[in-house]
Amino acid sequence: MPQPPVRSTTEVEVRYAETDQMGVVHHANYLVWFELARTRLCTLSGFHYHQIEELGFHLMVTSCKVDYRRGARYGDTLEVDAWLAELASRRLRFAYEVRRGEEVLATGMTEHVWVDASTGRLCRTPQPLREPFSRLASPSEDPNS
């Protein structure tokens, strides 16, 4: 039986500036929280997100999706989980869940591709990052094993 992927949990307190006229969090803020959780996940794997650029690569977002179930409001304390849902040689997909206590408010995903910063071309997972990203994936999804 495959092991579940590593998850990060990031706590977010909803700021007033993140809400709209209806008093709920504006939909675009969920993507910002996804980025916070994704960055935290990378840190848990043993590297900081900025190291990708230092190595001469970019991890470009090619797709994003958020499914909203309930609205978050100013002052709510939320937990945003992130995990690596798919790892392929040139692309990866992160999945997310936003909760207030036990209540799931939103789920989502972002898809990314590796790009060589010097050429702007698609490339395979950079060698120095294969091990850290493989640690995030469940064994059945690791193309490098």
Regions found by a protein language model. Give the residues of each.
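Terminal targeting signals and extreme-terminal segments of soluble enzymes
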Residues: 1-79, 85-145
